[in-house]
Curated annotation (Swiss-Prot):
Glycosylation sites: 13
Pfam families attached to this UniProt entry: Phospholip_A2_2
Keyword terms, alphabetized: Allergen, Calcium, Disulfide bond, Glycoprotein, Hydrolase, Lipid degradation, Lipid metabolism, Metal-binding, Secreted
Domain of life per record: Eukaryota
Cofactor, free-text remark: Binds 1 Ca(2+) ion.
Catalytic activity line of the entry: a 1,2-diacyl-sn-glycero-3-phosphocholine + H2O = a 1-acyl-sn-glycero-3-phosphocholine + a fatty acid + H(+)
General function of this protein: PLA2 catalyzes the calcium-dependent hydrolysis of the 2-acyl groups in 3-sn-phosphoglycerides.
Location within or outside the cell: Secreted
Cofactor or coenzyme needed: Ca(2+)
UniProt keyword annotation of Ribosomal protein present: no
Annotated organism of origin: Apis cerana cerana (Oriental honeybee)
Active site residues according to the UniProt entry: 34, 64
EC class name: hydrolase
Protein name: Phospholipase A2
Length: 134
């Protein structure tokens, strides 16, 4: 399913090429960049010492953070709002990044950790992290 007025926002894309964007160009450009993230983990794939047990692809936190910021700064306020709500709030997903071992959660909201506590005395390793709410 692709969000109306876009070619890249949803499962896959329906564009005829990498330069084609839908009516909501700003939102679509955010989705296109997100779709082209160089560090992704498909469902069932193992990478960086982690296994994606979700039924959908998960991305590096860098790519998800860039997507979040892009949507927030989009000129297409309504479409970016709905795409952001769908991806960050409705899909229960996580991202991964290289960080010192997580020891707990310093701040939590709506079941998601907003601020992690880490053990800086130990080496960094790839771990799963909750996405921010949109």
């Amino acid at each position: 399913i692709i969000y109306p007025g876009t070619l890249w926002c949803g499962h896959g894309n329906v564009s005829s090429g990498p330069n084609e964007l839908g009516r909501f160009k700003h939102t679509d450009a955010c989705c296109r960049t997100h779709d082209m993230c160089p560090d992704v983990m498909s469902a069932g794939e193992s990478k960086h010492g982690l296994t994606n047990t979700a039924s959908h692809t998960r991305l590096s936190c860098d790519c998800d953070d860039t997507f979040y910021d892009c949507l927030k700064n989009s000129g297409d306020k309504i479409s970016s709002y709905f795409v952001g709500k769908m991806y960050f709030n409705l899909i229960d997903t996580k991202c991964y990044k290289l960080e010192h071992p997580v020891t707990g959660c310093g701040e939590r909201t709506e079941g998601r950790c907003l601020r992690y506590t880490v053990d800086k005395s130990k080496p960094k390793a790839y771990q799963w992290f909750d996405l921010r709410k949109y």
